[in-house]
Amino acid sequence: MQQLGLSVIPESTGLVCVTPGPMNHRGLKYKLSDDAESQKTLELIHRMRDRLVKGSNMKSYKDELTLDWHDDMIWWGPGGIGASYTIDGYVKGHTKPFQDGLEFIKFNGHVLSSAEDDLGGWFGWPNLVMKPKGGYLGLTTASDIESEMRVVDLYRRDGYKLAENWIFIDHLHFLKLLGVDLLEKNKQLSYN
């Protein structure tokens, strides 16, 4: 919607842009993947996920992030959140607003988890259940409504840590379950 110039979500905390591919320009694979490299990537993203979900109840703390992420990491976030550069930028632009606005209820797991060489990822449909504490994307109020968050997460590993993350969140679905219909809101803005 933002690429069409439709602004139904308040200003993002990070940069909103057309999201590029991997910095190393190796997003397209023209030969068979190295199984050992693929396994390293999968193990790293699973370790990071387990630390996040099981260890800290979906809270990203800087000291934990440095265990799995390069300090100059880039997080390519979805509309309403935007991109963040460095761990400090990620904490400020995504983690804090996410944790301030949502309460983690449940992790449902992933439908698919896979890696090829230094790239890997997963998706869940839905993979999270969250409850609004108020203020998420400037659109929600605190309530006891639990909403499904459908997420696609893709990663690039550089050595022993993660360097890039592309995340796609189905905000249309998530917010509609909370009573915020972005498509209807767009219609109302268009007709006024």
Roles of regions detected by a PLM:
Residues 1-192:
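C-terminal and inter-domain tail/linker signature
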